[in-house]
């Protein structure tokens, strides 16, 4: 075996000296780590080993490999590489086909296709980056006369051909160095012959090899590049592919600028290898919409993609650009469209100049109109009369339901300008997640009370109570926190009212609550100032003060949420008591009538949006007294009719589609006289809404006809407070008045509730000659008690007819549309 190894060593030395296509790795594979010493023995004089190193260095420099002879062993500091690695550096050895990619004589990339992947191997992707040229194909010859391949083509046959060529080359090269494939016994004989060869013969051969190397160095030639590639490949079959290029065609670009000035960065020509991103031209007073490939501006283009061909004519489209103004845009609507979602639609007449490319939805201060913050943005439409739409999620932001919005543009980094009118949110009921229907009680009969026992005792179907702001501001117990518009408020939990409302809900009793600001130290910050009039019992909201207004909005939102649940809900909300008697019950200072209406309407609208965005079916009412075309006796007061008409106009102007309702007090005139059916002072109680002085239960149909004809049948009426005294005329007269009034309300389809003043006489009212209770001050039942308790039952006449006949006479003629069926049901048609 030692002789065989010596033979191999001599052959290796010759191959290092004489240019050959036999890969070094073929020889190196014959040596194990243990056989290196044997090889060294052959070169015991050192001359042959040194010569081999020189030759190896030249080859390595060509292929960027290491300058040491490879033995197949790994050095400690070099990490082992996988045989299946996709790409190798020149000189790196890997098992497979070594693919060398050339372009313009330069090796661009090498990688290895493992032998196992030969069947699925494909041509690599096209090269990129040769300016002015297009990659055409890969070719097996540099001049393009060889086999052609497109990226992605199979190269299975090419690899097979390379295999056969390599095998043939190896056979030829072995023959050239004197090796001949023979039977094993002949090989053994040759081993013996080699052992007998004298050292003189070996030295002669090595001298000859050295002479050949010297000649090569002197004439300046180098080994053939195919040999270098084969050596670099290691245990691989080397395959070379050449990139073939063809000159790219240039295409002309023509710009139709329509009075504009082109950007100098826009090219005049392009090739299919170019990707062109067009820049914006300029035109004074206009905004550039875009480039189009047609004069009718149908096909917009911003980029010429790579691979495009053909000349282009581009048309610049412009839209007039205007400076920001308060009327640059118009609001089509701002409304609730579904639970927790406000939708805003606007039209922008012309492109509005700004610091960026967006229009903004801005939340503005309801008083000053100044921008508080942006809550949405959309890209600017690049055409005249462009439509824009915003969708705003209000979850966690109850202030948005009561808030005011507008369209804005950005002037600078943190400054905005409003470019449209400002608007509140219409259809707030759509924002509610509670879609429960409006609760309709069994009948229209009701009473003012805060004790559930009074309600059940009288079989009342609806209850009314006053909710005073001082109660909400109490801090002695049960305080809750509530966050509104980024600020935390502290309100009383109103647990007594909560319990009453829950009891009523459970028993099928409809709930009506009236909100009033009473005179109290805790309510001073909500009013314009203390009234100079002793007659002032309640105040109105100071909506002109931003801080007061925010607190008011927070209160309304809090109440709407607290009493908007399915197990604790108020169906009817009333803002203020007899508000047309301003200095008595809604004092906002000595302001003009229009200012008074504006301040009341602002507060009403806030309450409306707050409660309806929590419980969509809730109703909100304005409260008026019976002085229809005449002022009451208060220092500052207005007629009920003028107040209602002015309010209706103002609230409609403030916010679209506010479905307000009317809570009316149909007391008799004078208040102490219960006989409203008498013919006295007939001219003051007419059926003409334009001329009648008062509207009481005597001519209540004048009110309902007026409201229906003027505002529609969707505007509902509740008679939220009236009472009939037993002081003058006696208890029978009081009982007859209650029964007749109820029958008139029950048979009128515009009226939803008839609520009497009190369960029991109150001492301060009795002192004024007003004994309006069903019981006296000591709790003794009056005649009116049983009449009221049973007048809405199926046996109604059993309890009412006697007093009606004795006190009224032909009472049925005074009740339009009377029928017994209407008395005991909720008649609304």
Spans of model-derived segments:
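Sec-dependent signal peptide cleavage junction
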Residues: 18-40
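Beta-strand-enriched, solvent-exposed domains that form extended recognition/catalytic surfaces
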Residues: 322-433
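Boundary/entry segment of secreted carbohydrate-active catalytic domains
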Residues: 419-469
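Substrate-binding cleft and catalytic face of glycoside hydrolase catalytic domains
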Residues: 461-481, 486-630, 669, 761-766
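Aromatic-rich peripheral "rim/lid" segments of glycoside hydrolase catalytic domains that contact
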Residues: 584-585, 728-733, 737-829
């Amino acid at each position: 075996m030692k002789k065989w190894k010596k033979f191999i060593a001599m052959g290796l030395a010759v191959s290092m000296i004489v240019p050959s296509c036999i890969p070094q790795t073929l020889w190196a594979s014959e040596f194990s780590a243990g056989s290196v010493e044997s090889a060294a023995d052959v070169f015991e004089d050192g001359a042959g080993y040194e010569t081999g190193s020189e030759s190896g260095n030249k080859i390595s420099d060509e292929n960027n490999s290491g300058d040491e002879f490879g033995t197949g062993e790994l050095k400690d500091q070099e990490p082992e590489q996988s045989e299946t690695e996709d790409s190798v550096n020149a000189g790196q050895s890997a098992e497979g086909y070594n693919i060398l990619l050339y372009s313009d004589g330069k090796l661009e990339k090498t990688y290895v296709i493992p032998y196992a992947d030969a069947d699925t191997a494909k041509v690599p992707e096209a090269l990129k980056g040769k300016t002015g040229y297009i990659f055409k194909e890969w070719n097996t010859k540099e001049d393009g006369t060889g086999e052609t391949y497109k990226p992605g083509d199979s190269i299975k046959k090419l690899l097979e051909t390379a295999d056969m060529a390599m095998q043939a080359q190896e056979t030829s090269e072995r023959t050239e160095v004197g090796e001949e494939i023979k039977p094993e016994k002949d090989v053994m004989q040759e081993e013996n012959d080699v052992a007998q060869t004298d050292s003189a013969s070996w030295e002669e051969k090595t001298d000859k090899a050295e002479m050949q190397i010297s000649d090569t160095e002197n004439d300046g030639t180098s080994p053939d590049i195919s040999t270098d590639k084969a050596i670099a490949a290691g245990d691989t079959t080397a395959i070379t592919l050449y990139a073939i290029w063809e000159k790219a065609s240039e295409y002309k670009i023509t710009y139709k600028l329509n009075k504009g000035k082109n950007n100098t960065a826009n090219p005049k020509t392009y090739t299919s290898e170019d990707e062109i991103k067009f820049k914006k031209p300029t035109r004074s007073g206009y905004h550039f919409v875009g480039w189009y490939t047609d004069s009718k501006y149908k096909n917009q283009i911003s980029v010429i993609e790579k691979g495009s061909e053909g000349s282009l004519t581009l048309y610049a489209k412009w839209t007039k650009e205007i400076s920001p103004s308060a009327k640059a845009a118009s609001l089509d609507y701002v409304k609730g469209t579904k639970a927790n979602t406000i939708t805003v639609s606007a039209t922008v007449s012309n492109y509005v100049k700004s610091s960026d490319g967006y229009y903004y939805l801005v939340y503005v201060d309801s008083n000053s109109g100044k921008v508080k913050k942006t809550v949405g943005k959309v890209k600017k439409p690049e055409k005249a009369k462009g439509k824009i739409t915003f969708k705003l999620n209000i979850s966690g932001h109850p202030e948005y339901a009561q808030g005011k919005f507008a369209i804005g543009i950005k002037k600078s980094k943190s400054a905005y300008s409003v470019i449209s009118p400002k608007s509140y949110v219409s259809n707030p009921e759509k924002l509610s997640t509670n879609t429960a229907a409006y609760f309709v009680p069994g009948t229209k009969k009701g009473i003012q009370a805060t004790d559930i026992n009074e309600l059940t005792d009288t079989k009342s179907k609806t209850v009314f109570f006053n909710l005073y702001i001082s109660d909400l501001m109490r801090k002695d117990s049960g305080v809750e926190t509530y966050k509104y518009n980024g600020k935390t408020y502290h309100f009383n939990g109103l647990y007594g009212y909560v319990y009453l409302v829950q009891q009523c809900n459970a028993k099928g009793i409809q709930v009506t609550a009236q909100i009033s600001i009473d005179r109290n130290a805790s309510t001073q910050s909500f009013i314009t100032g203390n009234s100079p009039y002793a007659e002032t019992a309640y105040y109105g909201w100071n909506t002109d003060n931003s801080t007061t207004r925010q607190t008011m909005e927070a209160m309304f939102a809090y109440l709407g949420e607290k009493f908007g649940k399915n197990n604790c809900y108020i169906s009817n909300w009333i803002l203020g008591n007899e508000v047309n008697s301003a200095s008595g019950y809604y004092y906002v200072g000595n302001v003009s009538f229009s200012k008074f209406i504006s301040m009341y309407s602002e507060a009403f609208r806030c309450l409306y949006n707050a409660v309806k965005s929590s419980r969509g079916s809730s109703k909100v009412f304005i409260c008026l007294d019976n002085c229809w075309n005449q002022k009451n006796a208060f220092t500052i007061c207005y007629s009920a009719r003028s107040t209602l008409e002015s309010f209706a106009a103002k609230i409609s102007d403030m916010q679209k589609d506010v479905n307000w309702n009317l809570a009316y007090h149909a007391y008799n005139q004078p208040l102490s006289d219960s006989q409203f059916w008498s013919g006295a002072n007939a001219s003051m109680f007419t059926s003409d809404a334009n001329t009648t002085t008062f509207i009481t239960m005597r001519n209540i149909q004048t009110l309902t006809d007026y409201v229906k004809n003027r505002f529609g049948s969707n505007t509902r009426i509740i008679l939220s407070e009236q009472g009939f005294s037993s002081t003058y005329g006696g208890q029978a007269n009081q009982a007859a008045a209650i029964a007749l009034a109820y029958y008139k309300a029950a048979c009128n389809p515009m009226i939803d509730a008839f609520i009497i003043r009190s369960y029991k006489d109150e001492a301060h009212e009795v002192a004024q000659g007003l004994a309006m209770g069903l019981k006296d001050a000591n709790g003794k039942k009056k005649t009116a008690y049983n009449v009221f308790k049973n007048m809405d039952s199926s046996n109604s006449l059993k309890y009412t007819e006697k007093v009606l006949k004795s006190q009224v006479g032909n009472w049925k003629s005074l009740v339009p549309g009377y029928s017994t069926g209407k008395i005991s049901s909720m008649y609304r048609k």
